Amino acid sequence: MPEYRSKTSTYGRNMAGARALWRATGMKDDDFQKPIIAIANSFTQFVPGHVHLKDLGQLVAREIERLGGVAKEFNTIAVDDGIAMGHDGMLYSLPSREIIADSVEYMANAHCADALVCISNCDKITPGMLMASLRLNIPTVFVSGGPMEAGKTTLADHKLDLVDAMVLAADPHASDEEVATVERSACPTCGSCSGMFTANSMNCLTEALGLSLPGNGTVVATHSDRKQLFLNAGRTVIELCHRWYGAEDATALPRGIATFAAFENAITLDIAMGGSTNTILHLLAAAQEAQVSFTMQDIDRLSRNVPQLCKVAPNTQKYHIEDVHRAGGIFGILAELARGNLLHTDVATVHSKTLGEAIATWDIIGTQDEAVHTFYKAGSAGIPTQVAFSQSTRWPSLDTDRTEGCIRDMEHAFSKEGGLAVLYGNIAQDGCVVKTAGVDASIHVFEGSALVYESQEAAVKGILSDEVQPGMIVVIRYEGPKGGPGMQEMLYPTSYLKSKGLGKQCALFTDGRFSGGTSGLSIGHASPEAAAGGAIGLIRDGDRIRIDIPQRAINVLISEEELASRRLEQHAIGWKPAQSRTRKVSSALKAYSLLATSADKGAVRNKTLL
């Protein structure tokens, strides 16, 4: 049987010094025979999705210790993409994913931890910890801080979120008082932003991957039911330790759970729920850490066959994550996919022998278990707070309407093709991605003239000064992982296009990426990126570009000869922005840029350069 990794620092006379230090942390004689379980917390007062996590690591620790383990907590960094957005701070967001992954690896390996509990929540923290867990391949459970409650105001008859505040702020017809009212109401509680944005998308995907417990992605941060998820995470990691160290059960390890089939399940869910395009970036990166050959081609293949069964903000104003929970949560969607034979139900999870068994237990349509029904009735209280587990509101009934409800069955899908698509063409030879769930059907085929910007800042200035007119395709380049560096999110440009009434009359194409809050004909992750010699760097003002989502195509309408001529010309002067940028790029960001791959590889480090 495998020995505890921690034995390296706890066993033998020569480890007396290490044990002396362990004792200084509070360990006793009998603790040296127990598994040492690392708790990777991500508490910070900078991020609403993490502001309530301070004491939750110790909640898990006490449960681990009660059940015979030794718990040791540490913290990672966490960047708030919304606060970092619109200025040079966004350059640091995606690179922080690698820092988080490395920091978890460093702590777990430096101290020979036997297992891991990841307390994550927001945009790059869950992906970074996911990458680390698959890299380490020790028993691991994920538990998130949970989603924020949606906001409410008398100015609108629908719920609010962060994007509403951003769009209204750029609307010249809105008064300062209206903007202030929405600003104060859009983000009322702690938790990750309330729509199907990147953070919530990733926390939902950990359920499909099998690495977190049911409800992880959908129980709001303020609800008392989430406390039980944290306690159960402590119990589950102890069980996983017994299964691996006591019985050498490989399905207790992240790589034994997150197999190729599990990654197919995750992207199938992603497509069905119209998740953030960032999830593609992060799943590709995680798959590489899992040593799974999961690529853009696999995503393209699945996107053609999976319908959209759930539509949530920003793709609609009707539903937020709290409504998904009321409709049965992620297992409600997984159950419908399973009924359509679109899932691998024989894969393992941290909490059930197979995903199929878990679906049978947690599907509100298929089970009569009152405890399960009660669990999915957990709702929001509408009381502004930064305190976790502070309310116990329950919906009077579940949303079991699979015809017109938040979650649909296969027959009544929101669309027959899913919410994410991969496009290819002469300006995205290795692919680019679009969240079709947020694109109006009238512009699934769109042709327009290019208006090229060499930075997000220039594009924002151009949009706000009315340079962008109906029928144009805004091209923002040199914003990829290497060229930015850091692959900035383009939520401000897309929000401002909406504010100008151009959401259905223009498109945006970039080698950067988009916030999970983005909707509209916004196509990102163009690969190769401009800084790596990608053809997006060859587009000129006035070029006609044709986007054809049904055919999964995007092309600039010029001859191959002209494209080749431009390539030679660009190669001679170097792949860099035509206009100089005032952007301050630190040595840390330069180091990231030197190793960064394009988005089709997950923007991970190019290991061939190491």
UniProtKB/Swiss-Prot annotation:
Homodimer. The modification N6-carboxylysine is found at K124. Pfam families: ILV_EDD_C, ILVD_EDD_N. [2Fe-2S] cluster binds at C122, C193. GO terms for biological process: isoleucine biosynthetic process; L-valine biosynthetic process. This is Dihydroxy-acid dehydratase. GO terms for molecular function: 2 iron, 2 sulfur cluster binding; dihydroxy-acid dehydratase activity; magnesium ion binding. Its cofactor is [2Fe-2S] cluster; Mg(2+).
